[in-house]
C-alpha cells in the first residue's frame, strides 16, 4: 500500500464552523496524520499523510465537509512524504 501526503486548500464557509475539528476527526479515523489550519484569506489548509486510499477518502469527505460548512473549491496537490505525529488543529 503506497503512502502519500497531500496538501489541500479548502475555500468556502470553512472558518468558524468546526471545519478543522471535523477534518482532524475524519483524518484520525482514517489513520492519517497531518493538520488543518485556518489561513488569513478565509480558507483552510489541510495536510494529510497516510495510505493513498485513506488520503483519497479524506479528500472526498473534504468536498462537502461537516454540515455546518459550505465548500466551494478544493485545490489539492501531492507533496513529498513527511512523517507527522497525530492530526493537529492549528
Curated annotation (Swiss-Prot):
Domain Acylphosphatase-like: start-end pairs: 5-90
Catalytic residue positions: 20, 38
A Pfam family the protein falls into: Acylphosphatase
EC code(s) of this entry: 3.6.1.7
Keyword rRNA-binding listed: no
GO MF annotations in UniProt: acylphosphatase activity
InterPro entries registered for this protein in UniProt: Acylphosphatase, Acylphosphatase-like_dom, Acylphosphatase-like_dom_sf, Acylphosphatase_CS
Keyword Hydrolase on entry: yes
Signal sequence annotation: none
Alphabetical keyword list: Hydrolase
Catalytic activity: an acyl phosphate + H2O = a carboxylate + phosphate + H(+)
Similarity comment text for this entry: Belongs to the acylphosphatase family.
Protein name (database record): Acylphosphatase
Organism: Photobacterium profundum (strain SS9)
Lineage: Bacteria, Pseudomonadati, Pseudomonadota, Gammaproteobacteria, Vibrionales
